[in-house]
């Protein structure tokens, strides 16, 4: 598989064309951002860790019959993926109150929710990715109601699989954000990544944060936290 022209450079990943028009190579960078890019740093090995963690998680999701864009992991930083048309939406799943939900609704961070909360945001940097509802998404042309039904069905399955996976690692899956895309064949699949960059992960015993909040909140120790998540996932895989 030959890597060709750069197609897209994002906050934490770069996407390259290949000699197969239906496939792309996703390269994980070491950039860390917060506040929609307002805060930025380069943290050695972060991209390698996220690539390894995402690979393990997508393997678990594949075993649960959840379709993803991942084909194979090529090396420390790169994955071969299906080329998809990304829905301009972020789907956020909240199992515990944290982050913007706590601020927006005046709820105490760490409160366990009786019901899982799904949110969608419109991916638009100029608008700071506003929170929208299903009707907004359809009015914007971002997705159809049928698309959203499929996305929510997949999201529920993903949350169940990930919650069980992390619980087995003694980690609480507080919340996470995911993206979906449509393949050339028309199938809606999970795209992008699932890593401590995109999840809030708290140690079950100590509530120690094992995610990008260590960067957002200037707590330090980001790579140590990501390595710990990877270690626990790898240990679980060996058992």
Swiss-Prot record:
Reactions it catalyzes: 5-amino-1-(5-phospho-D-ribosyl)imidazole-4-carboxylate + L-aspartate + ATP = (2S)-2-[5-amino-1-(5-phospho-beta-D-ribosyl)imidazole-4-carboxamido]succinate + ADP + phosphate + 2 H(+)
PANTHER family linked: MULTIFUNCTIONAL PROTEIN ADE2, SI:DKEY-6E2.2
Domain of life: Bacteria
One GO term (biological process): cobalamin biosynthetic process
EC assignment: 6.3.2.6
Protein name: Phosphoribosylaminoimidazole-succinocarboxamide synthase
Alphabetized InterPro entries for the sequence: SAICAR_synt/ADE2_N (IPR028923), SAICAR_synt_PurC (IPR033934), SAICAR_synth (IPR001636), SAICAR_synthetase (IPR050089), SAICAR_synthetase_CS (IPR018236)
Pathway where it operates: Purine metabolism; IMP biosynthesis via de novo pathway; 5-amino-1-(5-phospho-D-ribosyl)imidazole-4-carboxamide from 5-amino-1-(5-phospho-D-ribosyl)imidazole-4-carboxylate: step 1/2
Gene3D superfamilies: ATP-grasp fold, B domain, Phosphorylase Kinase, domain 1
Protein's organism: Dichelobacter nodosus (strain VCS1703A)
Keywords: ATP-binding, Ligase, Nucleotide-binding, Purine biosynthesis
Family: Belongs to the SAICAR synthetase family.
MF-aspect GO terms: ATP binding; phosphoribosylaminoimidazolesuccinocarboxamide synthase activity
